[in-house]
Amino acid sequence: MSQLFRFPSAIRRDPRIEAWMRGHAGELGAIAQRWFEVMRSCGDDVRELLHDGHPTACVADAAFAYVNAFRAHVNVGFFRGAEIADPEGLLEGTGRFMRHVKLSPERGVDAAALMNLIETAYTDMKNRLKAE
């Protein structure tokens, strides 16, 4: 049995995500939007949907990353984050599969390292789909 998180309803551009972004204005919304755009730009096979109330990026229908805004921070999360390389040690969390990077206006992040994590998660999911 596959342990991938699959969303057959994922589409190229989900208008609900645009509405979510408009509803999260300010610094935190800008942070979430910036990093979700990086996810969107990973490849032509990226699809998206609103899952559990937050923007989720998929390779075809297999979720690889998400953003979520809270009162004081934004999470950039990875569905198989526990299994991807994190040479800069950005990932937080202790779950079996998922990890996240916590961002805020006051808390700097190594943008190149986070971009690398997103690209790694995307490539990892592509490879998992090929292996199925």
Model-derived segments and their meaning:
Residues 1-132:
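Charge-dense, helix-prone N-terminal extensions
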